[in-house]
Swiss-Prot record:
It is found in: Cytoplasm; Cell inner membrane. Monomer. Residues 2-169 form the Era-type G domain. This is GTPase Era. Residues 36-40 are annotated as: G2.
Length: 290
């Protein structure tokens, strides 16, 4: 039996979270077309007759000097030191750029085994030729490259085979029925954050966080009170919406997702609160990221 840890790295919106959810068969990491939706290192667990793969979904790799981005980049670097294998995902719709150069430099310097995953092969009008040439120039061998579609589950079985080939014999780190090690509070707060991000202005993902105030199981139903914190007054108005339309929509969609994932009824009550410039507070950023 083989087992090991694999870090999923890549630029924002390359399909890292989609791959994690697809292979593990459950919604573990939130998904959004808006860059850097994932903030934390999210663990997903896949177990079959061959052994166990523990995936670590990391924040999107982005070169920036903002405090929040720097904190997320530290998460990426820390995850690399904990794994046996790096899965570097490239969206074949995008031309290789500065991030790819830096990412490959980090991977090579780590001396850790790696696979380069070219994602979204189900799409047309891609940059596959430019990317293939770029990887060749960087000395990446064909045996280290695999082409997949995480969303359509194309070649994901082959990917799992390649991952196991790079693992050694080892124990099951988690019981077979586990598909994540996240606490329920964190998972619920991430679901609410995902719904708040959807259909709202692009700057909001970087300016809001969710805090669970109350979480109780009452007669077989989840009772949840949660606060959505924003960094300035105008963002509060965007999330609440005209006559409370947006916050109502966020609550309804989050409630349905929570009920589906946890297979129980859910009573969810949301409140939007202002915490000025929270995304510049080192202590709070550290708590949210770690």
């Amino acid at each position: 039996m083989k087992s090991g840890f694999a870090a999923i790295l890549g630029r924002p919106s390359t399909g890292k979270s989609t791959l994690l959810n697809s292979i593990c068969g459950h919604k573990i990491s939130i998904i959004s077309p808006i860059p850097q939706t994932t903030r934390n290192n999210i663990k997903g667990i896949f177990t079959d007759d061959r052994g166990q793969i523990i995936f670590i979904d990391t924040p999107g790799f982005h070169l920036s000097k903002k405090k929040f981005n720097i904190a997320m980049m530290k998460n990426i670097h820390s995850s690399i030191g904990e794994v046996e294998l790096i899965l570097y995902i490239i969206d074949i719709q995008d031309k290789p750029g500065e991030e790819e150069n830096k990412m490959l430099e980090i991977i090579k310097n780590s001396k850790i085994k790696f696979l380069v995953i070219l994602n979204k092969i189900d799409l047309k009008n891609t940059k596959i030729k430019e990317i293939t040439q770029f990887l060749k120039e960087k000395g990446i061998e064909d045996s280290n490259i695999i082409k997949i579609s995480a969303e359509k589950k194309i070649n994901t079985e082959e990917l799992k085979n390649k991952i196991y080939e790079n693992f050694s014999e080892g124990p099951l780190y988690y019981p077979q029925e586990y598909y994540t090690d996240q606490e329920i509070n964190f998972r619920i707060s991430e679901i609410i954050r995902e719904k708040a991000i959807e259909n709202l202005k692009e700057e909001l993902p970087y300016s809001l966080y969710v805090d669970i105030d109350t979480l109780e199981n009452k007669k077989g139903s989840l009772f949840i009170r949660a606060n959505i914190f924003v960094a300035n007054e105008s963002q509060k108005g965007i999330i609440v919406g005209k006559n409370g339309k947006e916050i109502k929509s966020i609550g309804e969609r989050a409630r349905k997702t929570i009920a589906k994932i946890f297979e129980t009824k859910c009573n969810l009550f949301l409140q939007v609160k202002l915490k000025k410039n929270w995304n510049k507070e080192d202590k709070l950023i550290k708590r949210l990221i770690n």
